[in-house]
Amino acid sequence: DARAQATIDLLAVLAYGELEAFERLSQDALLAPNMGEREAVTDMAVGEYGHYKILVDGLRARGADPQAVMAPFRRPIDEFHASTAPADYPEALVKIYVGDGIAADFYREVAQFLEPDAKALVDEVCDDLGHSAF
């Protein structure tokens, strides 16, 4: 049904976004001015990969092939991040906090219309971004 497909689409775009965030944060960590900040950004990257795995499991539990359902979102997400690549560490921090915060707020709002288990999955991922710990 349409609602089930919309749920899969939302989980898929969020999953691919988390995978891309892992890759992006791994690169951003290299821009850090000291080892402490590099470790903190790397920890965030690891968290994003954990979110990706949670979402992939959620997709599989709904009978979806994660790679297939994420495929339509790859190009637009990759293009967005390529066009907003940070030039230095301060720009990377702005993107981490502002951009990712806006995305998390958007996903939380859309999740209000999902079935309770799917909403809980999105909330779990968005609530555990860990950026405030940095």
Where are these regions (language model features)?
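His/Met- and acidic-residue-enriched segments that coordinate or traffic transition-metal cofactors
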Residues: 1-12, 39-42, 53-57, 105, ...
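Acidic/His metal-coordination segments adjacent to aromatic residues that form catalytic metal sites
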Residues: 1-12, 73-96
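Basic/polar, acidic-poor N-terminal "presequence/leader" segments
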Residues: 2-32
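Residue-level recognition of alpha-helical structural elements
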Residues: 7, 34-37, 66, 89, ...
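Amphipathic alpha-helix face/heptad-repeat signature
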Residues: 14, 44, 92-96, 124-128
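Helix-loop segments that flank and shape redox-cofactor active sites
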Residues: 21-42, 84, 100-117
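Conserved alpha-helical segments that form or flank metal/cofactor-binding pockets of metalloenzymes
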Residues: 44-71
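A contiguous pocket-lining binding segment that forms or flanks enzyme active sites
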Residues: 108-134
